[in-house]
Amino acid sequence: MRQIEYGPDGGVDSMRIVEAEPPKPGPGEILIEVHYAGINGPDLAQRQGRYPPPPGASPVLGLEVAGRVAELGPSVSQWKVGDWVTALVPGGGYADYCVTSERHALPIPEGLTLAQAAALPEAWFTVWANLIDRAGLKAGERLLIHGGSSGIGLAAIGLARLVGAQPLVTVGNGQKAQFCQDFGAEVAIDYRQEDFVARVKQITHKEGVDVVLDMVGGAYLQKNVSILKRDGRLVLISFLQGSKVEFDFMPVMIKRLTITGSTMRPRTVDEKARIRDELLSQVWPALASGQVKTCLFGIYPLEKVGEAHRIMESSQHIGKLVLQLRE
């Protein structure tokens, strides 16, 4: 089978297609014939040496796929050969075949294409784990989402609307701002044109927001704390501006704030399976009905993986990018 390999320098140009033996599914696992593989920020971070795979995981890039179940491992009961699925995978998605737990696969939502479905798991597992499990986001609350036009950001908008919360977002240009508002954001703030702290305080009449979902880190940490209301929650999922910063904790104590966060890949099979079950019952019907929308920026053949990563690194995209491995 084909799979993507990258060199020790981690450069975009170091990625290349190599031939390898297909993996074998173990107990409770399924082998998926990959038709599409989603591209995510952790893929770029792994290639650059900033997000190594956990012990036992495939070193091949790719954390989500959509395709056909090709083989069943021992004790598999939820799927049969030939079923079409989308799945969160522990690695190995940039390949013709990959293995994952049967409990991390979901059916293709009615009305969605395979390509659209391939772009769902990583973002939706992440936003559910952080906004529902960690932050306890609920109806009537205000949520500020940084990186609102990213795959994670758009999923967070959808989840906020689904639970009855009001999503506000920050983005990098006017086009992204308009897109996010059309997608469901209450307010979209172009951080290059205005101070998001001042704008949030203006919008909320100085009250602040209940939850902030942050993938920026760095200097944003103190700013995020300043716009959280009493008993607010700051959820950290990435650190594009760095994970180390000088920080004043006094506002955290005065406002009784919670600072939390999580990563998805190191979680146990059982933890991911629980999130999968929640998505299947709470989100998948909303995707099928059109209540929750998806956004696919582009589809790239496996040979164009470098081009797709460059687009991701440029942050000029809106929504998700996927690789196509089969027609």
Write out the residue ranges for each language-model feature.
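Glycine-rich beta-strand-centered segment in the early N-terminal region that forms part
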Residues: 21-38, 48-92
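Short amphipathic alpha-helix with an adjacent loop that forms part of the alpha/beta core around
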Residues: 196-206
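Glycine-rich phosphate-binding loop and adjacent beta-alpha segment
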Residues: 171, 219-291, 324-327
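Short glycine-centered segments of the SAM/dcSAM-binding site in methyltransferase folds
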Residues: 84, 142, 166, 232-233, ...
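Mid-domain Rossmann-like dinucleotide-binding core that forms the NAD(H)/NADP(H) cofactor-binding site
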Residues: 118-193
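C-terminal capping/lid region of NAD(P)-dependent oxidoreductase domains
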Residues: 4, 284, 289-298, 306-327
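Short, glycine/polar-rich helix-capping loops at beta-to-alpha or helix-loop-helix junctions
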Residues: 93-96, 171-179, 244-249
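NAD(P)H dinucleotide-binding glycine-rich loop of Rossmann-like/cofactor-binding domains
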Residues: 78, 84-147
